[in-house]
Amino acid sequence: MSANESVVTADLKPRVPSTGSVDVLIVSGRSGSGKTSVLNILEDLGYYVIDNMPLSLLSDAAHKLTEDGGITNLALGVDIRTLKADSASFSAIYDTLLNSYGPDKVRIMYVTAQESVLVARFAATRRVHPLMAVNDYEIKNLPSAIIKETETLRPISGNADITIDTSQLNIHQLKELVREYVGADNQITVNVLSFGFKYGVPIDADFVFDVRILPNPHWEPQLRVKTGKDTEVAAFFANFPQVEEMKQDIYRYLDRWLPEFLHNNRHTVTVAVGCTGGKHRSVFLAESLYSMLSESLPREIKVMVKHREKAHWKA
């Protein structure tokens, strides 16, 4: 890192886009500094991410996505691969975006790290610096590549609204820093999902509860056509204390541990409740847990319910 390079990791200016507004964030930085990690974090926060697009297409793509595609949060990754052949045109493209969206809607985030840290990271990953891989500049060693890259990225770093030095940051600290900058709230979503084991276990489930041990309304002819959402099925389950016991056991566990996800940078948690066909037992418990958790969990946690096998239900 050069002596005159300014690094800011505090006093951030949070972005809090108003409803319906467009937020364009240009993300750039030195190779090995964590730019890709930042883009992944932004994607998790709901940004539509484009990385390594040719500069000549950047402005048109932004307009296409925001005006025709309805994208409101857009992150554009620009690095040495994009910039090296056309660095002089970045300022013009940046001005075009500013004129189109307004100066308060277009920001630049520049990611960097100390040169010694970058060298250590390249050594640890055994990756080749992009400028050495193509060798357009006849660069023979990593320190020279880092210096040349820093010079090439100067049009971007010089206009940056925020520069993040990742030298001493772990991934969790980086996430919090990015979240603070973009003004993201601390909300997570809990998806309560009913499913049938006969159709497979959901691969994205964080918790899976098997309720096949409970009495099955399927074997009652008058209930077979019903679902776990029907009052007749609820009345059936009311005759079996173990149904209420299992519901309370699952609820107490989730009520205790789901809030902990707020402290671990999780934004979506899927709670899957499974029975054989995904029509009676799992649906009843999923609906019950949805109602109970909606009442008890902190308001930062949004609870939703979905029944995966609904298409298999028969009238």
UniProtKB/Swiss-Prot annotation:
Pfam families the record matches: PapZ_C, RapZ-like_N
Positions contributing to GTP binding: 79-82
InterPro entries: P-loop_NTPase, RapZ-like, RapZ-like_N, RapZ_C
UniProt xrefs under SUPFAM superfamilies: P-loop containing nucleoside triphosphate hydrolases
Binding annotation for ATP: 29-36
Sample GO molecular function, one term: GTP binding
Transmembrane intervals: none
Keywords, ordered alphabetically: ATP-binding, GTP-binding, Nucleotide-binding
Leader sequence residues: none
Family from the record: Belongs to the RapZ-like family.
HAMAP family noted in UniProt: RapZ_like
Stated role: Displays ATPase and GTPase activities.
Annotated PANTHER family: RNASE ADAPTER PROTEIN RAPZ
Protein name, as recorded: Nucleotide-binding protein PsycPRwf_2129
Protein's organism: Psychrobacter sp. (strain PRwf-1)
